[in-house]
């Protein structure tokens, strides 16, 4: 990184996740959250972004943000201060590519930088908001490429506004060539169990089913299933699946999905789950409470000797059916 001093922008979950897998010797962190300046997060002192005004020629800024819209918003702030991508700032997804690629190669996958770059560009610059981490969407694309020879449909459970699926479908021909099932209530959470963070109960209600439907109108193999999983799963036509992506955040829905799809997953197929990450103890109060029900459901469902591959950079877990 050109030998300059390194500074982080963003003192939330993105910083905590990346510091576990891609530790970087940051000098300090900036964050515009009111009241955060002067505190310490992950061992780093937090300052106001104003500090960067006079630092442009002396530092390289790394954007630590979980969602592409947040990355884009920070990049806009940096551009207004005269910073330029690749010259004196990058985003942490580029670090994630470097740490995840060798792990995928060790599993027999062939990670591709061109696919990563396309996922990154679509996530940041398309009109469809993607709320999945850039590297997480790319990881899904690489797994779909790996499952090219596996028989079966594709399912994505937990769609929100459709951004992740939109990027995947525009990057990966495997996704376009097979039935691609999108399952969601398209109305936010129904109810939370005792092991889910109660303060997240109102999340994901800002969504319009008709708008999501319009996004995928020109993808002939995309099928949308609207409703709670306990309502839609019994109505699904009996199919085999090569790949299932689960991003429903909560314990009970994840449990229901695992019970339904695992028996219908073809040998060699893959289940990919989001929010399978345990945040470090003592996370700052401003950091949203992590969803922990997904990890609990996975641990309860699988036999104890089942290999689960963890990618804390993006809070994903992978399970292949052997």
Please identify what each model-predicted range represents.
Residues 104-107, 113-128, 141, 148-322:
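S-adenosylmethionine/decaboxylated-SAM
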Residues 135-139:
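N-terminal pre-P-loop "Q-motif" helix
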């Amino acid at each position: 990184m050109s030998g300059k001093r390194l500074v982080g922008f963003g003192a939330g979950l993105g910083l905590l996740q990346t510091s576990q897998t891609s530790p970087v010797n940051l000098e300090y962190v900036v964050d515009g959250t009111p009241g955060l300046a002067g505190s310490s997060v992950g061992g780093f002192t937090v300052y106001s972004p104003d500090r960067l005004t006079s630092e442009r020629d002396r530092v390289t800024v790394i954007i630590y943000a979980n969602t592409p819209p947040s990355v884009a918003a920070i990049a806009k702030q940096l551009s207004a201060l005269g910073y330029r991508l690749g010259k004196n700032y990058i985003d942490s997804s580029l670090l994630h590519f470097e740490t995840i690629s060798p792990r995928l190669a060790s599993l027999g996958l062939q990670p591709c930088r061109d696919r990563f770059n396309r996922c990154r560009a679509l996530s940041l610059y398309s009109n469809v908001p993607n709320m999945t981490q850039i590297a997480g969407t790319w990881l899904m694309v690489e797994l779909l490429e790996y499952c090219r020879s596996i028989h079966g449909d594709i399912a994505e459970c937990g769609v929100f506004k459709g951004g992740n699926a939109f990027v995947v479908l525009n990057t990966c021909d495997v996704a376009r060539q097979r039935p691609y099932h999108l399952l969601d209530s398209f109305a936010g959470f129904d109810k939370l169990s005792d092991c889910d963070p109660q303060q997240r109960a109102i999340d994901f209600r800002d969504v319009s089913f008709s708008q999501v439907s319009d996004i995928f109108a020109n993808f002939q193999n995309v099928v949308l299933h609207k409703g709670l999983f306990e309502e839609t799963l019994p109505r699904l036509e009996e199919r085999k699946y090569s790949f299932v992506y689960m991003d429903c955040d909560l314990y009970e829905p994840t449990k229901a999905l695992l019970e339904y799809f695992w028996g219908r997953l073809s040998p060699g197929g893959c289940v990919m789950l989001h929010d399978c990450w345990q945040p470090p103890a003592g996370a700052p109060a401003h950091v949203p409470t992590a969803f922990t029900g997904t990890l609990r459901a996975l641990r309860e469902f699988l036999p104890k000797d089942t290999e689960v591959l963890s990618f804390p950079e993006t809070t994903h877990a992978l399970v292949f059916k052997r």
